[in-house]
Amino acid sequence: MKVSLVLLIAVFGLAMVAAEETLESKLQMALKSLLQENEELNLEGRDTKGGCERATNNCNGHGDCVQGRWGQYYCKCTLPYRVGGSESSCYMPKDKEEDVEIETKDTVARCERDTKNCDGHGTCQLSTFGRRTGQYICFCDAGYRKPNSYGGCSPSSARELEYLSYVARDVEMEMLARDSVYQCNRDTNSCDGFGKCEKSTFGRTTGQYICNCDDGYRNNAYGGCSPRTEREIEYLSMIARDQELEMQARDSLPQCNRDTNYCDGFGQCVKSTFGRTTGQYICSCNDGYENNLYGGCSPKDNEDEEVDTDRKMEILRSLANLLEE
């Protein structure tokens, strides 16, 4: 009798749990339905798809008229456009409107006029990607950037060019990567004997195989390893320096002053406006001084003005270690 009672209670308990789960599911569905109904009631619906398209100017070209749950037609906008306005059409949210409008123009003639023919350093072309799709925008020549204050093309600074070169190198590495260690060894002649195929754990090549070249060698056009030039070593030294500066940057002015003892009295903490340290505070050292290990300012050693090859290779190895982390 006791066993039967226990079984009865267990069955009843399971039924209650199932009923609660069913009830919860129904409540969730009802809530979603109410939210959808409320959203549709706040929009101006049309009886037909054609009526919706006419009244909303085809959703301003940034969406499609679709039928809602009550039979009315509404604009379904393409992100980041949203339904708004008295006619319930598609509009760019105010917070994203300004920067897009600076760059984009409705016609090629307007683009050329407003940007002074892209300042002579680019061409007005029809954009086919992202928020600017279907509008005209300056495509700037190499060495120039966009947008400036009116959407034209301004010269890139030397540091910007260095940074963009680094990004281009990252993309190049992605194209050199292979899906397997066998494919990597075969296609690169085992890294030309100056490296080895390893699985990448960083950046766009993560999970693929790429030649990890020995010190003094770099990936060549087909992904193998060729000797580095002196100029390439200088360039990577600069990249390593950027990494070092990033580790020295502080989030606030007081923190920068405190941690560096006011730049050791030989500089001042300023907000960085470029590269990885943008928006953070870092010591800008006086002439004849340079950032030390903790981010302050120490006198430059004249003997260090000409860095020897061994030092460059040390920086290169440090960079490789940073990228592997």
UniProtKB/Swiss-Prot annotation:
Q: Does the keyword Transferase apply?
A: no
Q: Which UniProt keywords apply?
A: Cleavage on pair of basic residues, Developmental protein, Disulfide bond, EGF-like domain, Extracellular matrix, Gastrulation, Repeat, Secreted, Signal
- Name the record gives this protein: Exogastrula-inducing polypeptide
Task: Please state the span of the N-terminal signal peptide per the UniProt entry.
Answer: 1-19
Prodomain positions: 20-45, 160-177, 232-249, 313-325
A single GO BP: gastrulation
State its role.
The EGIP peptides are factors effective to extrude the archenteron toward outside of embryos. May have a role in the induction of gastrulation.
InterPro entries in UniProt? EGF-like_dom
Q: Which organism is it from?
A: Heliocidaris crassispina (Sea urchin)
Provide the disulphide bond pattern: C52-C65, C59-C75, C77-C90, C111-C124, C118-C138, C140-C153, C184-C197, C191-C211, C213-C225, C256-C269, C263-C283, C285-C297
What subcellular compartments does it reside in?
Answer: Secreted, Extracellular space, Extracellular matrix
Q: Which GO terms describe its cellular component?
A: extracellular region
